[in-house]
Amino acid sequence: MALTLEALVARFGGEIVGDGRREVGGLAPLDQAGPQHLAFLANPKYLAQVETTAAGAVLIAPRDLEKLGAAANGRNFIITPNPYAYFARVAQMFIDLAAPQRAAGVHPSATIDPAAQVAASAVIGPHVSVEAGAVIGERVQLDANVFVGRGTRIGDDSHLYPNVTIYHGCTLGPRAIVHSGAVIGSDGFGFAPDFVGEGDARTGAWVKIPQVGGVKVGPDVEIGANTTIDRGAMADTVIDECVKIDNLVQIGHNCRIGAYTVIAGCAGIAGSTTIGKHCMIGGAVGVAGHVTLGDYVIVTAKSGVSKSLPKAGIYTSAFPAVEHGDWNKSAALVRNLDKLRDRIKALETALAAREGDAGGA
C-alpha cells in the first residue's frame, strides 16, 4: 500500500519540501532505495548518499538539509527533528498495514481453564495453555505453545510469540511484546546455606528459599527471545513502563528496572538490584546483586558493575580488543605491577633520603 507524503505528514507531523503528492510504499536505505521508497538520514556522515539516492523522498533533519544546499533541488524531503524515530514509526505503520488480520477466537487445540477470563477479541493460537484465574485482555495475541499460569494477567493489545512461558501470579501491562522462548516468573536463585564442618568433613545442604513474589511488567515493554525474568522472593520483581530488553538477558529476583531503560543482549542483572530510569546497559554487562544504578546511567558492553553507580554518566570496565601480541605484553606488565610498585617506593624513599642529606649539608 502506497501513501503520499502529505498523508504521512498528516499522521506523523513534519514539513514537506518538494512534491507532497509523491507516493511511497516502503522504506529502504539511502544507497538501496528506489523511487517507490522512503529513505532516511540519521547520521550526517552519510550526507553524500542523499545527493545520489534514487529514493522517492528522504526523512531529514533541518540542519542536514541546510548542509545539502543546491544538491537538495528537485528532491523530496520530510523535515523532522528526529528522522530515525520518524522512520521507526512509519516502518511500524507499513508492517501493520501489510500484516494479515487474524480472526479472534480460540484454536481447538488450546487448553483454557473454565476459571480463566479470555476477552472475545483475543487470538489464542494452537496448543496454548491458560490456567485458572488468568486474565487475557482485549486484542491479546497468544501464539502457538504459549503458557500462561494461574492468576496471571496479560494486558490489552499484548503479543506473546510462540513458546513464551509466563508463570503464575505475574502481570504484563498493555501492549507488551514478548518474544519466543522468554520465561517470566521462574523461581529466583535463592538458597540458604546449612553446612557444618570443614573440607571433606563438611556436611549439610543448600535449603531452597520459596519464591513467593511475582513479576510486574509495565505498559509498552518489549522482552527479547530467551530472556528470563525471575519472580521475587517475597516482593515482586518490577519492570517499569517502556523498558526494552534484548535477547538472552537474565534479570534476577527482586530487581527493579526503571522506566525507559534499555538492556542489550547477554546482560546479567543479579538479584535485588535497582536500575534507574533512562539507563542504557550494554551487551554482556554483568551487574552484581544489591546495588543501585541511578537515572541516566550508561554502562558500556562487557563491563562488570560491582558497586552502586548513583551518578548519571558513562561507565566502562571492559578491556577493548587489541592484537594478541600487544595483549600478552600488557598482561605481562599487569602481572608485575606489584614489583614495579615496590621498586618505585624504594626509589622514592632513596630520593627523599638523598634530598634530606643534601639539605642538611
UniProtKB/Swiss-Prot annotation:
- InterPro entries per the UniProt record, alphabetical: Hexapep, Hexapep_transf_CS, LpxD, Trimer_LpxA-like_sf, UDP_GlcNAc_AcTrfase_non-rep
Quote the Pfam families the UniProt record gives.
Hexapep, Hexapep_2, LpxD
Gene Ontology CC, one term: membrane
* Keyword presence, Repeat: yes
What Gene3D superfamilies does this protein map onto?
A: 1.20.5.170, Hexapeptide repeat proteins, MurE/MurF, N-terminal domain
Q: Please give the pathway this protein is involved in.
A: Bacterial outer membrane biogenesis; LPS lipid A biosynthesis
Which E.C. number(s) belong to this protein? 2.3.1.191
HAMAP family, sorted? LpxD
Q: How does it assemble?
A: Homotrimer.
Would you tell me the protein name for this molecule?
Answer: UDP-3-O-acylglucosamine N-acyltransferase
**Source species, please?**
Burkholderia thailandensis (strain ATCC 700388 / DSM 13276 / CCUG 48851 / CIP 106301 / E264)
Q: Which gene encodes it?
A: lpxD
